[in-house]
């Protein structure tokens, strides 16, 4: 998962917003009526396709065209880098990590959606490291009186926050003593819900990573005979 180390198999018990779109092809068979010979001596006759007035009766009104749905308004984009750097609640360590990796590309993920009861979309920001894209800070900003206010922060890396059906879901990887940085022992998945002007923890799930999967040594190549 983005923002977390990849030394273990990702969790299988929870996956947010997983969906697969399946395209369905519909084929319409066009029937062709074969003309038969009339018994009244009129000869062969071609029968064309049925018309709408033959099915629905003469003078049937054509159905009104379906109304087009108006496109949803895209959320206003914010300068997340400036927002984080100007935020006094963000630690100096995270601000030091927030620097361009290549040219003017910053290691930052930004999501827009509803996780509070504000009138505008909330902004979820994840600050990552440049080298391995590990999350070092997760924040939620809520618009209040025309300005964005920090209403949530988590700065215990590796950490990553997501919006899941109106809830805030934060994943934190955990380490046992002796675990290398690339191989955490598990993760805590914490779901927060907005109530009474703050986030409260609803529930949490702990997942242990396998110690065997993915750790088999790579066999040495056999010498050419």
Curated annotation (Swiss-Prot):
Keywords, comma-separated and alphabetical: Cell membrane, Lipoprotein, Membrane, Palmitate, Signal
Region called Disordered, residue ranges: 40-77, 205-225
Principal location listed in the UniProt entry: membrane
A GO term from the CC aspect: plasma membrane
Biased composition (Low complexity): 60-73
UniProt-annotated location(s): Cell membrane
Signal sequence residues: 1-36
Function in brief: May be involved in the stabilization of the cell envelope or may interact with the sensor protein CseC to modulate its activity, in response to cell envelope stress.
Protein name: Lipoprotein CseA
Source lineage: Bacteria, Bacillati, Actinomycetota, Actinomycetes, Kitasatosporales
Encoding gene, per UniProt annotation: cseA
